[in-house]
Amino acid sequence: MLPFRTFLLALVCLLPLGVFAAPDDGGPVYELRTYTAAPGRLPDVLARFRDHTIAIFKRHGMESVGYWVPTDAKDGAGGKLVYILRHPSREAAKKAWAEFRVDPEWQAVSKASEANGKIVVKTESVFLAPTDFSMLK
């Protein structure tokens, strides 16, 4: 029994880690973002994206993949925006967000859209690397 266990342990140790996780090779990364709107303010969040934010993202090299709203109450229907951005690399994402935050147009749009209070109360971000079998690369 011991030789079999030793064989299994050796096999597991020799498996390349790349089989289990996509490498961070500087290639494209996707950013999954979820915004929770202040109560009753999702229409304001959507309008800000539709009318301003997407164009500002584009100007800073942030590629929009898609935008969605949950359809089930348990997932935040009526109060959340979920979207995905594509960045050339993690470093490019960091740079783009830094530039976006100080963009004069963004600052004006943000201030104007929040004249009656904050419209986003929670922001979540997850960076994702495509697997070797992903249609998005």
Q: Where are the model-predicted features located?
A:
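Surface-exposed interaction/gating patches
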Residues: 25-46, 52, 56, 130-137
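Bacterial N-terminal signal peptides
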Residues: 6-18
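An amphipathic, aromatic/His-enriched active-site/gating alpha helix that lines ligand/cofactor pockets
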Residues: 23-26, 47-65, 77, 86-127
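A short, glycine/Asx- and small/polar-enriched loop/turn
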Residues: 75-81
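N-terminal secretory signal peptides that target proteins for export/translocation
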Residues: 1-3
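Solvent-exposed loop/turn segments at secondary-structure junctions
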Residues: 70-74, 88-92, 131-133
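Solvent-exposed beta-strand motifs enriched in subsets of small alpha/beta binding domains
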Residues: 34, 83-85
